[in-house]
Amino acid sequence: MTTYFAHIPTIQFEGPDSKNPFAFKHYDPSARIGERAMADHLRFSVASWHTFCGTGADPFGVGTAVRPWRTPEERVDAAFEFFKKLGAGYYCFHDRDFAPEGATLAETHRTLEKVCRHALNRQQETGVKLLWGTANLFTHPRYMCGAATNPDPRVFAHAASQVKRMLEMTHMLGGENYVFWGGREGYDTLLNTDLKREQDHLAAFLHMAADYAREIGFRGQLLIEPKPKEPTKHQYDFDVATVIAFLKTYGLADRFKLNVEANHANLAGHSFHHEVALASAHGLLGSIDANRGDQLLGWDTDQFPTDVSEVVGVMLVILNQRGLAPGGLNFDAKVRRASTDLEDLFHAHIGGMDTFALALKIAHQIKQDGVLSGFIRERYGGYDDGIGRRIEDRNTDFKELEKYALDEGEPELRSGRQEKLENIVNHYLWRR
């Protein structure tokens, strides 16, 4: 079998003093952080579409990265060699990442199964697992007006067949999750759009997908990935709050959770921390696409995460909900257009993995010391008993509350201590 990364050493942990660019400075998979090994906390995954299909092409220029793999099988072989050498335990893929469209739908399905069986062999040889699979319902021209929300039921049926087969392949490969991202599920103009009907159709599609997943014995999480725009002007999975409302409106909240991406949060006008915290607060945080955007740009740049201070807050949320499993941290990120060498793929992932590993260590210490949770607990302490407890228990009404307010008089102002808390977090960031 051809090897593609023979010139790259296996990536090992060497510690923060190492100057080796092909070594982890903070990610030590076997190190214990609390009750779990670091690898179990982080559950890193490589995104096949960026890492093995990306060429650096953009709207202004053709691809710059020339990769040595050509056939679908070669792409799979290169991927698993990369996973193993990097030390990533998981991967994610779209059906079209490994298996191109055929002349007919039947041929497309046959090609997908053939390549997935090849991937299964590589999984068994390497021990690398599938974090999640998904269907590409946005690239082909048939999906220019959506898949589940397309005005043509023939397109809806085609999308259903594609998802049906990809659910089967994800199940065959032992995938722990399945993701739905509606890149074309939305509109460019309301002049030709029936909003209610399209969202009804999307809900019906998701119910059918969940039914079929259970029918074939798939017990993994079903996840929806929010994104407000790009490629569509307005997407129905705009942000975490929108998706939660959609799930609850259509009776899907007990069947789906969310896969939250950092860059998508920024495009929706939110911080990564906000979107993760909101999903977790509703018990719907299932997995994370780990990347970052550029605050000066208005599109999905999908850069590798390098900002430890941003990630610390996210890791606190994950620790507070006792982990992401069966979800994980998938690097939905790509090297820059001018980063054309194979070794750049390793540098990018090493940086992302070290960023999350260091953030995990810092977040764990903050949680252990209780410096934030203790303040929050005290800040809301008035709701632990008395009138506050009755409010939370819905055991009071406006008449009683008015009497209480008249008796108590003007409430005393209490500082939110934002600056102090920011200094505390900085102390943990700086003291290593």
Functional labels for PLM-detected ranges:
Residues M1-A65, I424:
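N-terminal basic, low-complexity leaders that serve as flexible interaction/assembly modules and, when applicable
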Residues A37-F44, P68-D97:
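Catalytic domains of carbohydrate-active enzymes, especially glycoside hydrolases
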Residues W49-T51, R96-F98, A135-F138, G183-E185, ...:
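Active-site beta-loop-alpha junctions enriched in small/polar residues
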Residues T55-E74, T193-Q199, K233-I244, N266-M353:
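Gly/Pro-rich active-site loop or hairpin
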Residues G283, D302-E422, N426-R432:
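Flexible, acidic glycine-rich loops studded with aromatic residues
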